[in-house]
């Protein structure tokens, strides 16, 4: 397919025209973002969950331009370190819309965030509460309740959060230490594919709200965390992931109504989307390093497609996902060969999980041919290495620039 036909094909599949045009115009490797698409996804989320406050999970895409675009739409920031707090403020997010969402933080982290003006902190232990009372006196705290992570591509169920029964004890400790026990939070796992996960989390939150009421504690908000899925991923076998987004939003709305009923009064809600906002609005213009053929230990022929980007420079999550690939200039009707897709480094982990499924690629690919890697806008910048094996991080560009190739210097 020609560059033009490639552009029209991916646009029809959900890639925005500006992003497709920028990829087609690029002559060198780069990560391209569509800021208008990110803003539109944010606005769609606000329509689905009216009245809910959005705190963008900065780790998903810590670029100033993305933060500024979201700030202009009214979003805040879920920051996990003083460095992220500083960046959010520089990008124009008011400090009142920044919370410290990481339950893991040192005394110095707490004191520095408090100095910067942050007054709302996540917690999940009485030890952290004691540190907050000392270094962020009078701060508002919300307690993270652990979830199982079932139904998510990444469960995230071990490092953060306390059992529902312990959340009451943590918030009582916060009250007794002079802090404001302001809320509860959950995280149902990243790229959550089921509505049932939010329903189960809401049931746990309801139990905690009842228990808090019996102890005379009333919170003012519930943070429903991240987990909202991107739409353009494929699983490790290459099957498109098709999250039931309408059902997920319906379950969240019903859950909010039920939690307000249990609470018996006003209750605000917060969400912390990351990949849901940015993944599908970022893509990489890469190139073919080499398409090779060699035999496995069992004697079978196997093709390997080595790209100029991989796990260490843009595709960190390639061990759990397959990203959709587009090959401009190659006809979609073939000939194609099944191949293992891998990155350029001298590291065996820099490859798709090829035991699960091979990827059909044009048999005529040559070194230097362009390749578009779609729906990789989440974690492509934040998870990249600074020069592993001498491969530099990809520059980034913005789809709304006329030439479509304006890279970060």
Model-found features: residue ranges?
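Short glycine-rich, flexible loops that bind phosphorylated cofactors or substrates
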Residues: 130, 150, 380
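Structural preference for beta-strand elements that scaffold enzyme active sites
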Residues: 53-55, 74-76, 95-99, 120, ...
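A charged N-terminal "starter" segment
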Residues: 1-134, 138-139, 176, 180, ...
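Charged (often Lys/Glu-rich) extended helix/loop segments that serve as interaction or gating elements
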Residues: 251, 261-409
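Short acidic, glycine/serine/threonine-rich loops at helix termini
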Residues: 67, 90, 110-114, 132-135, ...
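Active-site beta-loop-alpha junctions enriched in small/polar residues
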Residues: 57-63, 80-83, 103-105, 124-126, ...
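Active-site loop/helix belt of alpha/beta enzymes
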Residues: 147-292, 389-391
């Amino acid at each position: 397919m020609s560059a033009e036909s490639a552009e029209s094909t991916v646009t029809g599949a959900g890639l925005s025209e500006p992003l497709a045009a920028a990829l087609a115009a690029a002559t060198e490797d780069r990560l391209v973002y569509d800021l208008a698409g990110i803003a539109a996804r944010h606005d769609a989320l606000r329509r689905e969950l009216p009245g809910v406050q959005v705190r963008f999970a900065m780790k998903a895409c810590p670029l100033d331009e993305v933060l500024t675009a979201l700030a202009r739409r009214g979003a805040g920031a879920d920051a996990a370190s003083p460095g992220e707090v500083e960046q959010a403020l520089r990008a124009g997010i008011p400090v009142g819309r920044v919370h410290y969402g990481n339950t893991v933080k040192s005394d110095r982290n707490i004191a520095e965030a408090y100095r910067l003006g942050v007054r709302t902190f996540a917690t999940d232990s009485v030890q952290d509460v004691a540190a907050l009372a000392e270094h962020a006196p009078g701060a508002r705290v919300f307690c993270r309740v652990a979830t199982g992570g079932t139904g998510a591509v990444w469960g995230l169920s071990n490092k953060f959060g306390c059992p529902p029964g312990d959340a009451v004890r943590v918030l009582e400790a916060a009250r007794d230490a002079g802090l404001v026990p302001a809320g509860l939070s959950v995280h149902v796992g990243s790229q959550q594919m089921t509505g049932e996960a939010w329903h189960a989390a809401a049931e746990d939150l309801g139990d905690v709200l009842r228990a808090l009421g019996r102890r005379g504690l009333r919170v003012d908000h519930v943070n429903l965390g991240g987990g909202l899925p991107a739409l353009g991923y494929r699983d490790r076998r290459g099957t498109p992931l098709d999250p039931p987004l309408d059902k997920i939003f319906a379950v969240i709305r019903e859950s909010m109504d039920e939690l307000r009923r249990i609470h018996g009064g006003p209750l605000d809600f917060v969400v912390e989307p990351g990949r849901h906002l940015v993944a599908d609005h970022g893509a990489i213009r890469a190139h073919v390093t080499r398409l090779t053929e060699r035999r496995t230990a069992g004697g079978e022929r196997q093709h390997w497609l080595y790209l100029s980007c991989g796990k260490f420079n843009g595709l960190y999550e390639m061990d759990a996902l397959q990203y959709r690939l587009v090959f401009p200039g190659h006809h979609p009707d073939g000939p194609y060969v099944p191949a293992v897709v891998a990155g350029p480094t001298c590291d065996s982990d820099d490859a798709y999980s090829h035991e699960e499924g091979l990827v059909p690629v044009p048999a005529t690919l040559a070194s230097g041919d362009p390749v578009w890697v779609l729906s990789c806008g989440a974690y492509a910048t934040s998870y990249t290495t600074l020069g592993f094996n001498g491969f530099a991080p990809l520059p980034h560009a913005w789809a709304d620039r006329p030439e479509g190739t304006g890279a970060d210097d």
